[in-house]
UniProtKB/Swiss-Prot annotation:
InterPro entries: Hexapep (IPR001451), Hexapep_transf_CS (IPR018357), LbH_SAT (IPR045304), Ser_AcTrfase_N (IPR010493), Ser_AcTrfase_N_sf (IPR042122), Ser_O-AcTrfase (IPR005881), Serine_acetyltransferase (IPR053376), Trimer_LpxA-like_sf (IPR011004). Keywords: Acyltransferase, Amino-acid biosynthesis, Mitochondrion, Transferase, Transit peptide. One of its GO terms (molecular function) is zinc ion binding. The keyword DNA-binding does not apply. Belongs to the transferase hexapeptide repeat family. This is Serine acetyltransferase 3, mitochondrial. One of its GO terms (cellular component) is mitochondrion. It is an enzyme of class 2 (transferase). GO terms for biological process: cysteine biosynthetic process; cysteine biosynthetic process from serine. Ubiquitous with higher levels in leaves and siliques. Localized in vascular tissues, particularly in phloem. It catalyses: L-serine + acetyl-CoA = O-acetyl-L-serine + CoA. Residues 45-56 have a biased composition (Pro residues). It comes from Arabidopsis thaliana. PROSITE patterns: HEXAPEP_TRANSFERASES.
């Protein structure tokens, strides 16, 4: 039994602890239980024995032949189990292998070890953004409030993106709080969109030498932000919430000078470099790992309805000032030179240049390339073969 004076001082100390610690649940904080826990001698029990390891055959079967079925909302809990599959599904390269359950098919891929390293990089993007934000604050204290509100105080990548887009797309009659709730709901209910956001961040960081950090892209690259706003608008469009989808399209056009119809389908690993005056029509389809420069139009040829816009394959590079018009196909790994007007199909891994665009090497025997232009960003190597014009 404690003396009265000691009990009084002990009680006051507990009161000060409660009042200075907002994380303590005051309703469940009982003095008798706290005191007894402090002065009672507990008997140590031996640690439980670990469970026996599973049989080797079961382990192999679990790792190589089965893909767990999980709900989208629980995907973060099983991230390690899913990482080897998601990257294959969302970030396709020519010359890589894609694993689909017990089935293997050739899609031309990179080595598996590099895939796993890249998976880890995708998963760590949000942590890296936060680290970079704190580093920038230390270097430039003037950005402290902006970075704290945009990045440091946000609990997740989804919340930070919803906050950034809602601030940039709001106006007097469309408050940011309303947009934040809308964007957050879409992002939290669609982990595929969040995965695409991460892959787009990696694409910009890898392919654009002007991008100095992930946080730089996340806050300041309007091509990246316009693409993520389109992903949200497209999800609303598929839910038949077309009024909201078109409203977002309008605000993106006004704020970023980028005009994507919400019906257009956009892949992952997308780079919109500079992005000003990019126009993509309603029935256009853009594949994975595509790089598009500014002042590019993927449009129709008139006022006809139906499927009327271009289909862009994986790994395509589209140079600045290009117009690709009509329901035509730009093959996988093709390159479209700057200033071209493309009105006909372009075969895979070829280069089309000019107005009207012509294939490098001619229609009958076009020259092909092995590298992926959408990743290498090589915009000028074709010029010496296409023309002998020299300044």
């Amino acid at each position: 039994m404690l003396p009265v004076t000691s009990r009084r001082h002990f009680t006051m100390s507990l009161y000060m602890l409660r009042s200075s610690s907002p994380h303590i649940n005051h309703h469940s904080f009982l003095l008798p239980s706290f005191v007894s826990s402090k002065f009672k001698h507990h008997t140590l029990s031996p640690p439980p024995s670990p469970p026996p390891p599973p049989p080797m055959a079961a382990c192999i079967d679990t790792c190589r032949t089965g893909k767990p079925q999980i709900s989208p909302r629980d995907s973060s809990k099983h991230h390690d189990d899913e990482s080897g599959f998601r990257y294959m599904n969302y970030f396709r390269y020519p010359d890589r292998s894609s694993f689909n359950g017990t089935q293997t098919k050739t899609l031309h891929t990179r080595p598996l070890l590099e895939d796993l390293d890249r998976d880890a990089e995708v998963d760590d993007v949000w942590a890296k953004i936060r680290e970079e934000a704190k580093s920038d604050i230390a270097k430039e204290p003037i950005v402290s409030a902006y970075y704290h509100a945009s990045i440091v105080s946000q609990r997740s990548l989804e919340a930070a993106l919803a906050n950034t887009l809602s601030v940039k797309l709001s106006n007097l009659n469309l408050p940011s709080n309303t947009l934040f709730d809308l964007f957050s709901g879409v992002l939290q209910g669609n982990p595929d969109i969040v995965e695409s956001v991460k892959l787009d961040l990696l694409a910009v960081k890898e392919r654009d030498p002007a991008c100095i950090s992930y946080v730089h892209c996340f806050l300041h690259f309007k091509g990246f932000l316009a693409c993520q706003a389109h992903r949200i608008a497209h999800e609303l469009w598929t839910q038949d919430r077309k009024i909201l989808a078109l409203l977002i399209q309008n605000r993106v056009s006004e704020a970023f000078a980028v005009d994507f119809h919400p019906g257009a389908k956009i892949g992952t690993g997308i780079l919109l470099d500079h992005a000003t005056a990019i126009v993509i029509g309603e029935t256009a389809v853009v594949g994975n790992n595509v790089s598009i420069l500014h002042n590019v139009t993927l449009g129709g040829t008139g006022k006809q309805c139906g499927d009327r816009h271009p289909k862009i394959g994986d790994g395509v590079l589209i140079g600045a000032g290009t117009c690709i018009l009509g329901n035509i196909t730009i093959g996988e790994g093709a390159k479209i030179g700057a200033g071209s007007v493309v009105l006909k199909d372009v075969p895979p891994r070829t280069t089309a240049v000019g107005n009207p665009a012509r294939l490098l090497g001619g229609k009958d025997n076009p020259k092909t390339h092995d590298k992926i232009p959408g990743l290498t960003m090589d915009q000028t190597s074709h010029i010496s073969e296409w023309s002998d014009y020299v300044i």
